[in-house]
Amino acid sequence: MIITILPSSANFHAIAYNEMKVEKGVATLLEAQNILGLRQEAYTPEKLRQYFLDYSSRNTHIQNAQFHVAVSCKGNEYTHQQLLDIAHRYLKEMGYAEEGQPLLIYAHHDTPNNHIHIVTSRVAPDGHKIDHAHEKRRSREIT
């Protein structure tokens, strides 16, 4: 299994990327948590992006609030459900699982390898910045 932390962003570009994959039929939104005030049938790329921007504005000191991660395996070694379970454990160990933390998890079907993408904010529900010290090292240790 490979977990890759993808580039952060001030504008939550990962949402548009993943939603474009959904529109093309090569990805599925597996899970959306804590997207308050939006019914899932009302989700659009722009509404989701705006939600994450508004949520992240709780801490104006964080310039690139997007946290975007890909979790993949060789072929079909893990099902998307197993990758989803791995993603939840990963988020907890990395500090992104506080109650109220918004997140989107997408399953991608555009390569021979099962993989998912996670999009969340580096801002915790109480407004503090989620610790990112030694993030890549900690991420490697989890896998």
Please annotate each region the language model reported:
Residues 1-143:
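N-terminal nicking endonuclease/strand-transfer module with a His-rich metal-binding environment
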